Swiss-Prot record:
EC number: 5.4.2.12
Reactions catalysed, as given in the entry: (2R)-2-phosphoglycerate = (2R)-3-phosphoglycerate
Protein name, entry field: 2,3-bisphosphoglycerate-independent phosphoglycerate mutase
Pathway the protein takes part in: Carbohydrate degradation; glycolysis; pyruvate from D-glyceraldehyde 3-phosphate: step 3/5
Lineage start: Bacteria, Bacillati, Bacillota, Bacilli, Bacillales
Cofactor binding notes: Binds 2 manganese ions per subunit.
UniProt-listed InterPro entries: Alkaline_phosphatase_core_sf, BPG-indep_PGM_N, Metalloenzyme, PGAM_B_sf, Pgm_bpd_ind
Source superkingdom: Bacteria
Modified residues (Phosphotyrosine): Y36
GO cellular component: cytosol
Length: 510
């Protein structure tokens, strides 16, 4: 029996875990979610590792989750692709990398590597930076500088020492490379148009402006003394003995930006690649004739060379709905809007025929623990109005709160975030059921299920725990061995629509 509208409701970062300590999902009062879990068919899904095209044991994330959900198949992720190419040796023959290295040899200029110094595997992996250093040595590049971004979010909040020491060990092993600047990801990897943050990173890289230190460990020591953890380290310059910067980015240099996930690499890349950039005044030292390489395709708005080009995903859920003349709505607040649009559509920027999008602005606060409800109420107000207007056959909705507040590593704000989302969930599901529709309530990965470790430390990273799935249709059962790729086929099943052969996921309905 076909249902309309069908809403796929993604509670971002809402994982399931038996241990209640540090578990905001367990601590939160969430009467609506609990009622749906008890009343309707439900199961759990794997959202990590090889189930979503990542290496075994790797935690999932929002980009990967939405790609898999929208594609209806396991999508092999950039991390897996790059790792494989290093293992098989293709990485070291990559023509895009070779051209960048040839460029600096010809111009007698420097190669700069930008990247998140972390093995979190969400935005980057430090092994990829190590591989580039090996390759630069093989290619006889003489001057290589690393501009390192500190994580503290997908890994422990004060774990940077491990990565800075590892990087120095690699420089020593290869006999090449120096650390030039160090930045908290809060600055260098902003994705919310807070150009004042990005400008601090740019000015450190190009002008050598900002706090200066003899080495990365001295910088860390100073930051920690001032209660600044890795993520928030102020963009800083590493200097030689005489106090001059180790390196700045200059005319004719080359850059390889070694993050593979686009969303937090776009803004900094635009600063260096776009002639018509208007975010801030780049000044007279803006590097000219810069040879800029992105590890993966970041965006149409970034004018750089791409080392690992995208693999095309045909017949994602959005495309199939459009082909079969179903209307669809994508709705989220700023922080997760790219996920329900670009990533959900398999890396496609444009809307499909019959697709509408609603973007609700995320609140302008320094960190979301200060406003745990974020813009959930505004998203819900807009969506309930759309449901009552009966315009859309399918709705893709993301509530950002459990993930974005969960990254704070603070229990109380994350509990509040979930309670706000639960209130909103009740309003959305009520509106759907009143119209004879159905909801699939699920998540893309875990996070809020562990925000404090068992020994009381903040846990800011995602988890590998299973995620829930509830289908608000009685009289059916759901199988227990599902993965995120099974959600799109389930949407099509509820609609009574045909599933394309490219979708290797299977409906969760038994």
């Amino acid at each position: 029996m076909s249902k309309k509208p069908v809403a796929l409701i993604i509670l971002d970062g809402f994982g399931l875990r038996e241990e209640e300590k540090g578990n905001a999902v367990a601590h939160a009062q969430k009467p609506n979610f609990d009622r749906y879990w008890n009343e309707f068919p439900h199961a759990t899904l794997r959202a990590d590792g090889e189930n979503v095209g990542l290496p075994e044991g790797q935690m999932g994330n929002s980009e990967v989750g939405h790609l898999n959900i929208g594609a209806g198949r396991i999508v092999y992720q950039s991390l897996t692709r790059v790792n494989l190419s290093i293992r098989e040796g293709d990485f070291f023959k990559n023509e895009t990398f070779i051209k960048a290295m040839d460029h600096v040899k010809e111009k007698q200029s420097a190669l700069h590597i930008y990247g998140l110094l972390s093995d979190g595997g969400i935005h980057s992996h430090i092994d990829h930076i190590y591989a580039l250093l090996d390759m630069a040595k093989q290619q006889n590049v003489e001057r290589v500088y690393v501009h390192g971004f500190l994580d503290g979010r997908d890994v422990g909040p004060t774990s940077a020492e491990v990565y800075l020491k590892g990087l120095q060990d690699k420089f020593d092993e290869v006999g090449l490379g120096k650390l030039a600047t160090v930045h908290g990801r809060y600055y260098a990897m902003d994705r919310d148009k807070r150009w004042d943050r990005v400008e601090k990173s740019y000015r450190a890289m190009v002008y050598g402006e900002g706090p200066s230190y003899k080495n990365g460990l001295e910088l860390l020591d100073d930051s920690y003394k001032n209660n600044i953890v890795d993520e928030f380290v102020i963009p800083s310059v590493i200097t030689e003995e005489d106090g001059t910067p180790v390196a700045t980015v200059k005319d004719d240099d080359a850059v390889i930006f070694c993050n593979f996930r686009p969303d937090r690499a776009i803004q900094l890349s635009q600063v260096f690649t776009n002639e018509d950039f208007r975010g801030f005044d780049r000044g007279e030292k803006m590097p000219k004739r810069l040879h800029f390489v992105c590890l993966t395709k970041f965006s149409e708005t970034v004018k750089g060379f791409v080392a690992f080009k995208p693999t095309n995903l045909d017949n994602t859920l959005g495309e199939v709905l459009s082909q079969q003349n179903y209307t669809q709505l994508r709705i989220a607040e700023t922080e997760k809007y790219p996920h329900v649009t670009f990533f959900f559509s398999g890396g496609r920027e444009d809307e499909f025929p019959g697709e509408e999008r609603i973007l609700i602005n995320s609140p302008k606060v320094a960190t979301y623990d200060l406003k745990p409800e974020m813009s959930a109420y505004e998203v819900t107000d807009a969506l309930v109005k759309e449901i009552e207007g009966e315009k859309h056959d399918v709705i893709i909705l993301n509530f950002a709160n459990p993930d974005m507040v969960g990254h704070s590593g603070m229990l109380e704000p994350t509990v509040k975030a979930i309670e706000a989302v639960d209130e909103c969930l009740g309003r959305v599901v009520d509106a759907l059921l009143q119209k004879g529709g159905a909801a699939i309530i699920t998540a893309d990965h875990g996070n809020a299920d562990e925000v404090v470790t068992l020994d009381g430390k903040p846990m800011t990273a995602h988890t590998t725990n299973k995620v829930p799935v509830i289908v608000t249709e009685k009289g059916i059962t759901l199988r227990e061995d599902g993965i995120l790729a099974d959600l799109a086929p389930t949407v099509l099943d509820l609609l009574g629509a045909d599933k394309p052969k490219e979708m290797t996921g299977k409906t969760l309905k038994q």
